[in-house]
């Protein structure tokens, strides 16, 4: 069934096409960053994970072009996973920047593990806060879904 001119689904085709183009550009950027950062394990792993996610999301993006509006949950899931990927790549870039500044202006023998060992208690608090955030968000979404259904 083809979308009619006034049903609003045909307007999303250009958004889905732009999404596919951005995903292809991001794949090129992350794979290039992986090659440029050889030797920095954390940065390589982060960019590799981002590149793998982008490759796996291409079929969903192509599906959104072929059938705009068929499954609105696809866009919501892709948006959420894209935000996680952006946060992960940003963390990798920040780690690379911090290590560069530490080597340039401070201790030349400093590495990520020596910096992280000073923040050990903070990492446990951050993980605890993340777990609580996910649990509370899930319970709120569940309650909202129940309110919508009934």
UniProtKB/Swiss-Prot annotation:
Q: Please name the source species.
A: Picea sitchensis (Sitka spruce)
As for membrane topology, the entry says:
Multi-pass membrane protein
Name-wise, this protein is CASP-like protein 2
Extracellular topology ranges = 39-41, 104-121
Please indicate which superkingdom the organism of origin belongs to: Eukaryota
- Tell me the organism's taxonomic lineage: Eukaryota, Viridiplantae, Streptophyta, Embryophyta, Tracheophyta
- Family recorded in the similarity comment: Belongs to the Casparian strip membrane proteins (CASP) family.
Q: Which UniProt keywords apply?
A: Cell membrane, Membrane, Transmembrane, Transmembrane helix
Residues annotated as transmembrane: 18-38, 42-62, 83-103, 122-142
A single GO molecular function, which one? protein-L-isoaspartate (D-aspartate) O-methyltransferase activity
Q: What is its main location?
A: membrane
Q: Which InterPro entries match?
A: CASP/CASPL, CASP_dom, PCMT
Biological processes per GO annotation: protein modification process
UniProt GO cellular component terms? plasma membrane
Q: Where in the cell is it found?
A: Cell membrane
Q: Which residues lie on this side of the membrane: Cytoplasmic?
A: 1-17, 63-82, 143-150
Question: Quaternary arrangement and interactors, per the entry?
Answer: Homodimer and heterodimers.
């Amino acid at each position: 069934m083809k979308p009619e001119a006034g049903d609003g689904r045909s307007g999303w085709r250009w958004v889905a096409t732009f999404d596919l183009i951005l995903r292809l550009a991001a794949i090129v950027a992350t794979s290039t960053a992986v090659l440029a950062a050889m030797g920095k394990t954390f940065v390589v792993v982060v960019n590799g994970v981002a590149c793998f996610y982008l490759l796996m999301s291409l079929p969903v993006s192509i599906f959104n072009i072929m059938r705009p509006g068929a499954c609105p949950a696809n866009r919501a899931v892709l948006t959420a996973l894209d935000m996680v990927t952006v946060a992960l790549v940003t963390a990798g870039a920040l780690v690379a920047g911090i290590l560069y500044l530490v080597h340039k202006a401070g201790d030349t023998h400093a590495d990520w593990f020596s910096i992280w060992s000073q923040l050990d208690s903070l990492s446990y608090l951050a993980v605890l806060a993340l777990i609580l955030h996910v649990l509370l968000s899930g319970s709120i979404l569940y309650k909202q879904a129940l309110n919508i259904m009934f």
